[in-house]
Amino acid sequence: MDAKTNDKSAGKCPFTSGRSHRIRDWWPGQLDVQVLHHNSNLSDPMDEDFDYAREFESLDLNAVIKDLTALMTDSQDWWPADFGHYGGLMIRLAWHSAGTYRITDGRGGAGAGQQRFAPLNSWPDNVLLDRGRRLLWPIKQKYGRKISWADLLVLSGNVALESMGFKTFGFAGGRADVWEPEELYWGPEGTWLGDERYSGERQLAEPLAAVQMGLIYVNPEGPNGKPDPIAAATDIRETFFRMAMNDEETVALIAGGHTFGKTHGAGDASLVGPAPESAPIEDQGLGWNSKFGTGKGGDSIGSGLEVTWTQTPTTWDNNFFDTLFKYEWELTKSPAGAYQWQAKDAPAITPDAHDTSKKHVPTMLTTDLSLRFDPAYGKISKHFHENPDQFADAFARAWYKLTHRDMGPRERYLGPLVPKETLIWQDPIPAVDHALVDDKDIAELKAKVLASGLTVPQLVSTAWASASTFRGSDKRGGANGARIRLAPQKDWEVNQPAQLKTVLARLEAIQSEFNGAQTGGKKVSLADLIVLAGCFAVEKAANDVGIDLKVPFTPGRMDASQDQTDVDSFAPLEPRADGFRNYIGSRHQFMTPEEALVDRAQLLNLTGPEMTVLVGGLRVLGANAADSRHGVFTKQPGTLTNDFFANLLTMDTVWQPVAGQDDVYEGRDRKTNAVQWTGTRVDLIFGSHSQLRAFAEVYACTDAKEKFARDFVAAWTKVMNADRFDLHR
């Protein structure tokens, strides 16, 4: 809502500000592996046995809601409430906490309280939201560890809506805080509000969703500040689609959110000070301090826009649509010089936020007019205008989706306000309704799987394909549900559909035979059997080279149906690249292969050593896509050896690019010049990158064969269980 600010929010250039240079300042093209080690327990101030879910479940949520409700109308002199109510501010606070979510990679969102940290706390679009967090601090301080900042930010938005007469759909807790900023890719730009993310005919680069650096969604003045409602609608549609919202949800969210509060552009934006991260130390993390008038209340400057959408900005009603359709609109500028629109030939009927004796002519943003003048949005807006109950329901559901989209499956939701209805975007999976297999059953299934004719590479690659869709960002994907047998996953190129069909058919036959022979309701799900078969294959691969180990397995997965699977919603989970399988798809664009490997490892919540041992193990086990031989640095494929590392690091091999093949290399014997191996950038990075080479050296040592196998099994099990929220919350 408030989006525009000046350049004072930017920090100083690292090369001219007198500080020492980091390694990546000297070698900016160096692969960044440190992203795999962020938010470790070394930065966590909580006790080792701290369990946020347990703490939240002991919270008196009604007491928190009561305190939040009281806060809404307890205007503070240091930051007076607009219209005597902080509701508009708290809605924007919650919205912008959740609104960074993007469906392409599941990153962003409200799930970790990242709005407290740079860069989000100092984004132009988050101007003055630091005031909202400071208003919440006494409540956070009161309830301490029982409610996270992440949960409190979302809850404050819900309570704000409820306190102004709106009935929300529900609220779930369970968002545990993190303690350091995430190093996410927010765009290529080096300046606030830059838009180098576009190419061609306004093609927005992936995985981005927002239109400019430092914005949550779109520029409220219009594309690049040009006040064109139709062009703005194009940006809105693309951006909200990339945040998993359709047209109806988009209209409901914008109109619902703009039913309350106002924007702030009372005067010259050049009088506004720097953002929190570059504010003077004595300002104690409060940014955007203004020298215009009092700098607060009626003198507030945020986005530079000065718009109050309705005549009842602290009440839920249909006034937004009433105003939008009642008047014709003419272009004007705010006192801060930002483009906005005012009602033509309209009386001054909109209240002032801080002076009850003043009234204003109705105003709107360029992006508000998009909801009327874009044909598709206009049709939806008229329907909502004529059917306010349907508008209220649509906004309630869209707000719930916005604020909970990155929480993952419903089983992670905590608290008494979780709605009973299960929604398709929650990727539902049936609850376990049968007795689970025991050790004796597992032994029987192992014998059947190993006698089925399926190979170690087939079983390993199928289990990996099923489990490795998991994204720690929004807790989606994973082996639970066995969605690898359903559209769209069964048809993904990386999953080798023809081979996958064969493997699944044989596993389904084993499942059917086993379940048909049971009494007492015992069953094995296909989801469990896929993982179990992969575990059997890993055990066999280790045993075949004399390493005796057992791969842990815990039953309890269930099989989802096609009706429980939104094909369009699952499409973004398709890997454009998967370095673990040495796969680069035709649509892969925005990263090098080795960057894509680290990116996928980060989504799987893997550390650098875990990523390293998994790549080395999956190569020798033959799990490459399309049965590629790249990176299979072993003479005994299908066995769990440390050959990948030993053969990569030897000085007996010389590597050189293969002519005509992008990112493919051949390793030749240094003496005979005979080709020994072929590999990709993903393979060779473990010998080239100094930190990854250090990890690889550990596993290449002669005495590391068993350690390699044990570490591989541990990392494998972590991925297989990544979505088992019944085992870890």
Swiss-Prot record:
Coiled-coil positions are none
Cross-linked sites for Tryptophyl-tyrosyl-methioninium (Trp-Tyr) (with M-243): W95-Y217
CC annotations in GO = cytosol
Q: Which InterPro entries match?
A: Catalase_peroxidase, Haem_peroxidase, Haem_peroxidase_sf, Peroxidases_AS, Peroxidases_heam-ligand_BS
Enumerate the PROSITE patterns for this protein: PEROXIDASE_1, PEROXIDASE_2, PEROXIDASE_4
Which CDD domains does this one have?
Answer: catalase_peroxidase_1, catalase_peroxidase_2
Q: Which cofactor does it need?
A: heme b
Pfam families documented for this protein = peroxidase (PF00141)
Enzyme active site: H96 (proton acceptor)
Q: State the top-level EC class.
A: oxidoreductase
Residues engaged in binding heme b: H258
For this chain, the Swiss-Prot or TrEMBL PTM comment says: Formation of the three residue Trp-Tyr-Met cross-link is important for the catalase, but not the peroxidase activity of the enzyme.
Query: Known EC number(s)?
Result: 1.11.1.21
Cofactor: record remark? Binds 1 heme b (iron(II)-protoporphyrin IX) group per dimer.
Show which residues form the site (Transition state stabilizer): R92
Record keywords: Heme, Hydrogen peroxide, Iron, Metal-binding, Oxidoreductase, Peroxidase
Question: What positions does the cross-link Tryptophyl-tyrosyl-methioninium (Tyr-Met) (with W-95) connect?
Answer: Y217-M243
Q: Name one GO molecular function term.
A: heme binding
Quaternary structure and partners: Homodimer or homotetramer.
Give the protein family.
Belongs to the peroxidase family. Peroxidase/catalase subfamily.
Q: What does this protein do?
A: Bifunctional enzyme with both catalase and broad-spectrum peroxidase activity.
Protein name (database record): Catalase-peroxidase
Q: Which organism is it from?
A: Nitrobacter hamburgensis (strain DSM 10229 / NCIMB 13809 / X14)
